[in-house]
């Protein structure tokens, strides 16, 4: 088992280049199945979720060739299976995108209930609702989800009961080769939803309206390959923005789309942080105190839930009382117990957390309970004077490429080391 060892109290300075978007990559990689051809995907982040997605494609029969660290050639012409292995499905939440892609091309698919972060129930009922409306039947037995369209898929009018990124993306994946037109309403509008639609259209699909409440998909008989570059990662960029602010640093964050960062930028500015925008970069610097905020997470273009733990860490040292209301995911406040170990004064009541700012955080042994909580703990450790250790860092590496190297490049004192096994573990 590995862990991060971080000695904090040093402002971050310098430049950091943002990787491709995880949430776009895990949708676009399954979408290559629809091409039935050769696709070249550029700007793929070198993270474990992408590695699992590529492994799934390989097991299904795709021919995969790495052109460089962030570019892969994927040939899905001759797939040999529509069943995603259980052990791979459970390693990442986004494995459910293989349901929509395989169903669309082959009329059937089987995937285990997805894994990934422990953020409470993440039901896929809205995904199954879309599949059913298009003419598929589904069953869930012993943790395996099976979908099948014996008579093929036919376009339909689908209204999602709640805004869901996953359901919106699976709705597009399953509809692109259905007969006729599909209308998806109450859709998610996140940048990675738009990125998936753009990729599908590059492959010959007819998807219109992505980024709005209503997406219209006109089915096509066949699709083809393309070369496509994934958008920069909005949440990775936001994470480094918060890290710069939290440490009192000055960081230029490159390879970003500033418009995608507007909800984060607005909150940081209200907290007293200077954010300067350029064409494809932002500069974040802080010289004064952090001011208290009220944050309510919402679907895009609201404040992203993935950034909530990171902002919580920042607000733990604000000059006053801050509140965060979590409106998207249950269990998103799991990081608070770890933050309290560092001296933070935080009270959680249901989906609302109240932060009474303290002067500073102190080092502590920490645990990454999920991806974004883990990133928040990294920032907290960077803020604290002294050395902290973070365990269960596999969660963090699911979504952050080269986080140790990137932070070191900004002057952070961080390393990854093997965790010595406990005595009981050694005896087993």
Where on the chain are the PLM-derived regions?
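Short, structured segments at the rim of ligand-binding sites
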Residues: 1-428
């Amino acid at each position: 088992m590995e862990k991060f060892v971080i000695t904090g109290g040093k402002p971050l300075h310098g430049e950091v280049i943002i990787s491709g978007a995880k949430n776009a990559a895990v949708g676009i990689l399954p979408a290559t199945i629809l091409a039935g051809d050769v696709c070249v995907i550029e700007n793929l982040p070198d993270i474990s979720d992408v590695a699992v997605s590529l492994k799934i494609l390989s097991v299904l029969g795709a021919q995969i060739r790495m052109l460089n660290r962030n570019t892969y050639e994927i040939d899905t012409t001759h797939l040999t299976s529509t069943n995603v292995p259980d052990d791979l499905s459970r390693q990442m939440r986004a494995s459910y995108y293989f349901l929509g892609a395989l169903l669309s091309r082959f009329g059937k698919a089987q995937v285990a209930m997805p894994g990934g972060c422990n953020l409470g129930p993440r039901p896929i009922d809205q995904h199954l609702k879309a599949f059913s409306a298009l003419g598929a039947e589904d069953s869930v037995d012993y943790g395996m989800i099976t979908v099948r369209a014996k008579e093929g898929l036919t376009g339909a009018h689908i209204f999602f009961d709640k805004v869901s990124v996953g359901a919106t993306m699976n709705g597009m994946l399953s509809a692109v080769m259905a007969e006729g037109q599909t209308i998806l309403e109450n859709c998610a509008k996140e940048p990675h939803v738009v990125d998936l639609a753009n990729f599908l259209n590059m492959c010959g699909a007819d998807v219109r309206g992505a980024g709005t409440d209503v997406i219209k998909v006109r089915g096509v008989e066949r699709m083809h390959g393309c070369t496509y570059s994934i958008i920069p990662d909005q949440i990775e960029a936001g994470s480094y923005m918060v890290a710069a602010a939290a440490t009192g640093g000055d960081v230029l964050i490159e390879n970003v789309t500033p418009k995608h960062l507007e909800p984060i930028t607005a909150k940081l500015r209200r907290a007293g942080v200077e954010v300067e925008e350029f064409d494809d970069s932002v500069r974040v610097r802080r010289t004064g105190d952090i001011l208290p905020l009220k944050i309510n997470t919402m679907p895009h273009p609201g404040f992203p839930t993935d950034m909530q733990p990171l902002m919580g860490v920042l607000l733990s040292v604000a000059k006053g009382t801050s509140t965060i209301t979590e409106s998207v995911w249950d269990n998103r406040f799991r990081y608070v117990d770890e933050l309290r170990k560092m001296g933070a004064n935080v009270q959680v009541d249901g989906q609302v957390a109240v932060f009474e700012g303290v002067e500073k955080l102190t080092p502590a042994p920490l645990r990454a309970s999920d991806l974004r909580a883990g990133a928040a703990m990294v920032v907290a450790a960077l803020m604290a004077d002294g050395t902290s250790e973070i365990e269960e860092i596999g969660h963090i590496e699911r979504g952050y490429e080269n986080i140790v190297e990137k932070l070191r490049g900004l002057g952070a004192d961080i390393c990854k080391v093997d965790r010595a096994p406990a005595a009981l573990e050694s005896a087993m």
